[in-house]
Design a protein with these regions (language model features):
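Short, hydrophobic/amphipathic alpha-helical patches that form generic packing surfaces
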Residues: 15-22, 53-55, 86-96, 131-138
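N-terminal interaction modules that seed assembly of large macromolecular complexes
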Residues: 1-55
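Intrinsic-disorder-associated interaction segments
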Residues: 6, 26, 30, 34, ...
C-alpha cells in the first residue's frame, strides 16, 4: 500500500476519521462506523485513479522536503504559507473524486480540525489524507443510510 509505505497506516486513517465521528441514522455506534469506513476505504483504494492522485501528493511532499518544488523554496514549503493552495486543491480533488460535493464538505471539516495523524503530516500529505478521510467518511454516512432496514420508519 502506497500510504503505508509512506508512514500512514490504515489504522491511522480509521482513527483520524473516528475522532470527528458523530452518531447518525444507521451509524449509532463507533464500532459500526469503523467497519463501514474500513470497507469504504478499501473500495476507494481499489481505484487506480485515486491511488495515482494520492501518489502525486506523496511525490509533492518529498520534493517539498528536498526543496525542489518549482518556484517554492524549502523554507516556504516548511511554513505552509497561505499563498500555496496546490495542497488544498489536491485534497479537495481527492475528496470530490471519492464522494462528490459531500466529500468536499467532509474534507473541510477534517482540514480545519486536523484530528489524528493530520496534525503530524506535512503540507501536502495533511491535505491528501484529509481528502481521503473526508471522501470516505461521506461515503460511510451515505452507505449507513442505504443499508438501514427500509421497513423501520423510526430509522430516519
Amino acid at each position: 500500500n502506497v500510504m503505508e509505505d509512506n508512514g500512514v497506516s490504515k489504522r491511522a486513517l480509521v482513527d483520524t476519521a473516528m475522532e470527528l465521528f458523530f452518531s447518525h441514522p444507521g451509524l449509532e455506534t463507533q464500532e459500526k462506523a469503523e467497519n463501514i469506513f474500513t470497507r469504504e476505504l478499501d473500495i476507494a483504494f481499489s481505484d487506480p485513479n485515486l491511488c495515482i492522485l494520492v501518489y502525486s501528493g506523496i511525490l509533492l511532499e518529498k520534493e517539498g522536503k528536498a526543496g525542489t518544488l518549482p518556484n517554492l523554496s524549502k523554507r516556504s514549503y516548511e511554513k505552509d504559507l497561505s499563498f500555496i493552495i496546490a495542497d488544498e486543491v489536491l485534497g479537495m480533488s481527492i475528496s470530490k473524486y471519492i464522494s462528490g460535493d459531500k466529500g468536499m464538505f467532509e474534507y473541510v471539516r477534517f482540514d480545519k480540525e486536523k484530528p489524528g495523524i493530520l496534525s503530524k503530516l506535512g503540507p501536502f500529505m495533511d491535505d491528501v489524507v484529509a481528502g481521503i478521510v473526508g471522501g470516505v467518511s461521506a461515503n460511510m454516512y451515505t452507505r449507513a443510510i442505504a443499508e438501514m432496514d427500509p421497513d423501520n420508519d423510526s430509522n430516519i
